[in-house]
Curated annotation (Swiss-Prot):
Signal peptide: 1-20
Name recorded for this polypeptide: Insulin-like 3
Classification via InterPro entries: INSL3/INSL4, Insulin-like, Insulin-like_sf, Insulin_CS
Description of how the protein assembles with itself and partners: Heterodimer of a B chain and an A chain linked by two disulfide bonds.
Family: Belongs to the insulin family.
UniProt disease annotation: Cryptorchidism: One of the most frequent congenital abnormalities in humans, involving 2-5% of male births. Cryptorchidism is associated with increased risk of infertility and testicular cancer.
Job of this protein: Seems to play a role in testicular function. May be a trophic hormone with a role in testicular descent in fetal life. Is a ligand for LGR8 receptor.
Lineage, opening ranks: Eukaryota, Metazoa, Chordata, Craniata, Vertebrata
Source domain of life: Eukaryota
Gene (name only): INSL3
Keywords associated with the record: Cleavage on pair of basic residues, Disease variant, Disulfide bond, Hormone, Secreted, Signal
GO terms assigned for molecular function: hormone activity; insulin receptor binding; protease binding; signaling receptor binding
Gene3D superfamilies in UniProt: Insulin-like
Prosegment location in residue numbers: 58-104
GO cellular component: extracellular region; extracellular space
Amino acid sequence: MDPRLPAWALVLLGPALVFALGPAPTPEMREKLCGHHFVRALVRVCGGPRWSTEARRPATGGDRELLQWLERRHLLHGLVADSNLTLGPGLQPLPQTSHHHRHHRAAATNPARYCCLSGCTQQDLLTLCPY
């Protein structure tokens, strides 16, 4: 076996490997974040569930504190799929044409839904931090 063969293989496969791995994620790249991936990214960018200065009491549970903060910011509503959709008496479902507009209007006002549908940058997530 020729000792130069591994070197040639590396020269030929090196660029292919770099190309296959793709570009490294940058803060400007949009990433679709849904459900717990959105929450984890938000905690990673903002620093953690105990970042708030509003109450300096000991946390009984980090997850509970984070969920309460998300609920106050109206972010949790977009993470929970409401499977119990019932119409009250006399209410009719909206025509199918307006469903598209409602869907995009909800995504525009709900950051969690927007990040799931369109993707968020790190800068977008930073705007949701409480400080």
